[in-house]
From Swiss-Prot:
<dbReference type="GO" id="GO:0004370">
    <property type="term" value="F:glycerol kinase activity"/>
</dbReference>
<comment type="similarity">
    <text>Belongs to the FGGY kinase family.</text>
</comment>
<feature type="binding site">
    <location>
        <position position="16"/>
    </location>
    <ligand>
        <name>ATP</name>
    </ligand>
</feature>
<dbReference type="GO" id="GO:0046167">
    <property type="term" value="P:glycerol-3-phosphate biosynthetic process"/>
</dbReference>
<feature type="binding site">
    <location>
        <position position="352"/>
    </location>
    <ligand>
        <name>ATP</name>
    </ligand>
</feature>
<dbReference type="Pfam" id="PF00370">
    <property type="entry name" value="FGGY_N"/>
</dbReference>
<dbReference type="GO" id="GO:0006641">
    <property type="term" value="P:triglyceride metabolic process"/>
</dbReference>
<keyword id="KW-0418">Kinase</keyword>
<comment type="pathway">
    <text>Polyol metabolism; glycerol degradation via glycerol kinase pathway; sn-glycerol 3-phosphate from glycerol: step 1/1.</text>
</comment>
<feature type="binding site">
    <location>
        <position position="168"/>
    </location>
    <ligand>
        <name>substrate</name>
    </ligand>
</feature>
<keyword id="KW-0319">Glycerol metabolism</keyword>
<dbReference type="InterPro" id="IPR043129">
    <property type="entry name" value="ATPase_NBD"/>
</dbReference>
<dbReference type="GO" id="GO:0019563">
    <property type="term" value="P:glycerol catabolic process"/>
</dbReference>
<protein>
    <recommendedName>
        <fullName>Probable glycerol kinase</fullName>
        <ecNumber>2.7.1.30</ecNumber>
    </recommendedName>
</protein>
<dbReference type="InterPro" id="IPR018484">
    <property type="entry name" value="FGGY_N"/>
</dbReference>
<dbReference type="GO" id="GO:0005739">
    <property type="term" value="C:mitochondrion"/>
</dbReference>
<feature type="binding site">
    <location>
        <position position="86"/>
    </location>
    <ligand>
        <name>substrate</name>
    </ligand>
</feature>
Length: 539
């Protein structure tokens, strides 16, 4: 049903372009896989030109089908939105629009030495100025009395940007590029260097170099934006030793930034299938999923079950600083005159990757479906637990010394119990992150909305509902990330209002009694304790 909204979903492993109708239903889509480059251990890169080519190819394929099937005219497409892999960082020459280096992907760990450097820099400033952590949940004890807790060096910038010092975020990647790439330094010296996350790179090129922008959600993942002012912060930039003048202009997540004007000359521009269409929505991928799930009320949350889990919890207009190591981020901002909505974010490192581990490493099954079937064939795990701390434990424990364990094994244990324990471990970790979010925010969760590849597993969602003691709801379409970007663009152009009916595809309600739930959580805590102190992190 006309009109239509398009959405570019530029992710870590692929690029997609999806066309939605006025009802929010998918009309057409195309996907292209991306090449990841690993020039050194721990390094992950993308070719910026390949990303652009994949976007254009997806658009061309969809638009060809659009016209061949008489869906409408170009004028029936009112806008496009963009959602993207967050934190991935690219720099380019503003005169040539050519990348000065491959994009450094969010999961790249090359900046770990910089993390140590900035931690030491922060520690000196903390010690010199005796800075206290006002958000700490623990205190030091001196002479039998509780005292104030000194700020940890990794949290030195957290009050302003909501993030700890980590190789994950864009600011350190930009610092690395300046330290290690002569082409970047030369372009900066000429006044020709621009930096951006992937959304900035796409908007710059789609508008023919007219718009150097990012939105508040992507900017909030750089460590360079002040959460209160929604602007680049000079103190943050100075601390991380990056030039503020090369950063994109920060805009809301829903407004017309520019129009598609792509091509080397006017003739090529006119021939682009989306020429003249407004670019009107930009959101980082996890925030886009929140919007796509219609999580607009304070206290609503979503979990994306993929390789790991990404959980976001809407805290409304409040900037909530976690006492459990969760991240504080911008959830969305619909229009430059609207107040921003904030969120707490937490992650589960091993979810779908735990299932892959059972298949690829342990040979327990040949497919994800077989894992689900095995898990369904038993009523419980037979008292065993799997703690997938392959690289330590994330929120709320933050223990680098932890490693994966299976505990509670007996002669009765078989591969069905192991399969079920892996699914349960994802749900137990999700419970702990959501529990921390509720404690930090002071709000009670009413239901959990879910998406991602693992959300197809109904047993997983039932277990999750049982452990949370809350309904778990999934939408009809699991393409919530793409729809979130389209929705932001649709709001900016008047296609949709700021609320839309959430289309339920499945609802799972608790079936586990409270005593069994309490016992299971108690045993999980015991299993967690067995995973600790495996690695000496001090040496």
């Amino acid at each position: 049903m006309k009109p239509y909204i398009g959405a570019i979903d530029q992710g870590t492993s692929s690029t997609r372009f999806i066309l939605f109708d006025k009802n929010g239903d998918i009309v057409l889509s195309h996907q292209i896989l991306l090449t990841q480059h690993h020039p050194h251990p721990g390094w992950v890169e993308h070719d910026g030109n390949e990303i652009l080519e994949s976007v254009n190819k997806c658009i061309q394929v969809v638009m060809k089908q659009y016209y061949e099937n008489n869906f409408g005219t170009k004028e029936d497409i009112k806008a496009i939105g963009i959602t993207n892999q967050r934190e991935t960082t690219i720099v380019w020459d503003k005169k040539t629009s050519k990348p000065l280096n491959n994009a450094i992907v969010w999961c790249d760990t090359r900046t770990k030495d910089l993390v140590n450097y900035f931690n030491n820099k922060a520690k000196k400033l903390i010690d010199d100025n005796n800075i206290i952590d006002n958000n700490s949940k623990s205190t030091t004890v001196v002479d039998g009395a509780q005292g104030e807790c000194k700020l940890e060096s990794k949290n030195y910038l957290r009050e302003k940007c909501g993030l700890p010092l980590s190789s994950y975020f864009s600011g350190l990647k930009l610092k690395w590029l300046f330290d290690n790439c002569e082409s970047v330094r030369e372009a900066y010296g000429r006044g020709d260097c621009l930096m951006g996350t992937i959304d900035s790179w796409l908007v710059w090129n789609l508008t023919g170099g007219k718009c150097h922008i990012t939105d508040v959600t992507n900017a909030s993942r750089t460590m360079l934006m002040n959460l209160k002012t929604l602007s680049w912060d000079k103190e943050l930039c100075d601390f991380l030793e990056v030039p503020i003048e090369i950063l994109p202009n920060i805009h809301s997540s829903s407004e017309i930034y520019g129009h598609v004007t792509m091509g080397d000359d006017e003739q090529q521009q006119q021939q682009h299938p989306l020429h003249g269409i407004p670019i009107a929505g930009v959101l980082g991928d996890q925030q886009a999923a929140m919007v796509g799930q219609m999580c607009f009320e304070k206290g609503q949350a979503k979990n994306t079950y993929g390789t790991g889990c990404f959980l976001l919890y809407n805290t409304g207009n409040d900037i909530v600083h976690s006492r459990n190591g969760l991240l504080t981020t911008v959830c969305y901002q619909f229009g430059k005159d609207s107040p921003p909505i904030y969120a707490l974010e937490g992650g589960v490192a091993v979810a779908g990757s735990g299932v892959r581990w059972l298949i690829d490493n342990m040979g327990i099954a040949e497919s994800s479906q077989e894992i689900e079937d095995l898990a369904k064939s038993v009523q419980d795990t037979g008292g065993m637990y799997f703690v997938p701390a392959f690289s330590g434990l994330f929120a709320p424990y933050w223990r680098d010394d932890a490693r994966g364990v299976m505990v509670g094994l007996t002669h009765h244990t078989n591969r069905c119990h192991i399969a079920r324990s892996v699914l349960e471990s994802t749900c137990l970790q999700t419970f702990e992150v959501l529990d921390a979010m509720q404690k930090d925010s002071g709000n009670k969760l009413v239901e959990l909305r879910v998406d991602g590849g693992m959300a197809k597993n109904n047993l997983l969602l039932q277990i999750q509902s049982d452990l949370l003691g809350l309904p778990v709801v999934k939408p009809i379409s699991l393409e919530t990330t793409c729809f979130g970007a389209a929705f932001a663009a649709g709001i900016a152009t008047g296609v949709w209002k700021e609320t839309m009916q959430f289309k339920i595809g499945g609802k799972f309600t608790p079936q586990l009694d409270e005593n069994h739930k309490t016992q299971k959580l108690k045993e999980w805590k015991k299993a967690i304790s067995k995973s600790l102190d495996w690695i000496d992190t001090k040496n």
